[in-house]
């Protein structure tokens, strides 16, 4: 689905609020449809074959920027995402171990899911580990952050800090600086709602994220940990 050029120049909900009502009314149905597809998935004809993809898969294909631009539809990925939905729906499941070949797109797919889940979750934390701290950082800065930056404004929560952070992507309301002038004039601050959700990465180690509650942890290149670090010990953490 082609992204409307008229909406491309709108970067935040605050920009959207500045537009006239007649402009916004023209796009309400389009935006509602995108939220429906994100939640329920999408059906289409693939070379004449009726095909269903999950909402998470749709977000990856439609709204996730990867190294080659837009992702291609692959049947293997469609099955992967259906299985992933089964994992999330099963309370007995702790996650997925995915053995793959090279260039299968898993790093981008997991990055897209981190952003997808983080932007609809409140008071949550999402993490990244890889075979080394530098690899985890690279996944964060080169994959997760660009996907978040290129989300359309209607999927993009209020964000604190830089547009392209190096260590933490924080979907929360930026702290407001209380100045003497504001206190003396009793200036009313605009109340904004934020998700209070973050995505970050850590250096590789047995105790990485020890004692921290994560809603989702992406273990990239988890079979390549180098001694003395052992992913089995980290899994028990």
Can you describe what each PLM-predicted range is?
Residues 1-237:
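Phosphate/NTP-binding elements of NTP-utilizing enzymes
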């Amino acid at each position: 689905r082609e992204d409307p050029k008229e909406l491309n120049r709108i970067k935040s909900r605050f920009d959207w609020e500045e537009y006239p009502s007649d402009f916004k009314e023209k796009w309400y149905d389009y935006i509602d449809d995108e939220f429906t597809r994100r939640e329920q998935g999408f059906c289409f004809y693939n070379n004449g074959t009726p095909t269903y993809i999950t909402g998470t898969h749709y977000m990856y294909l439609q709204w996730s920027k990867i190294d080659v631009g837009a992702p291609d539809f692959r049947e293997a990925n469609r099955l992967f995402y259906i299985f992933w939905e089964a994992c999330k729906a099963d309370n007995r499941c702790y996650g997925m171990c995915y053995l793959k070949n090279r260039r299968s797109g898993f790093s981008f797919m997991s990055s897209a899911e981190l952003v997808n889940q983080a932007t609809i979750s409140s008071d949550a934390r999402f993490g990244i580990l890889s075979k080394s701290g530098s690899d985890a950082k690279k996944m964060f800065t080169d994959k997760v952050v660009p996907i978040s930056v290129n989300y359309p404004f209607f999927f993009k929560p209020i964000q604190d800090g830089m547009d392209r952070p190096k260590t933490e992507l924080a979907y929360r309301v930026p702290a407001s600086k209380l100045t003497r002038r504001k206190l003396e004039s009793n200036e009313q601050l605009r109340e904004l709602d934020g998700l209070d959700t973050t995505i970050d990465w850590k250096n590789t180690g047995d105790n990485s994220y020890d004692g921290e509650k994560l809603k989702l942890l992406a273990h990239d290149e988890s079979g390549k940990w180098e001694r003395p670090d052992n992913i089995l010990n980290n899994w028990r953490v």
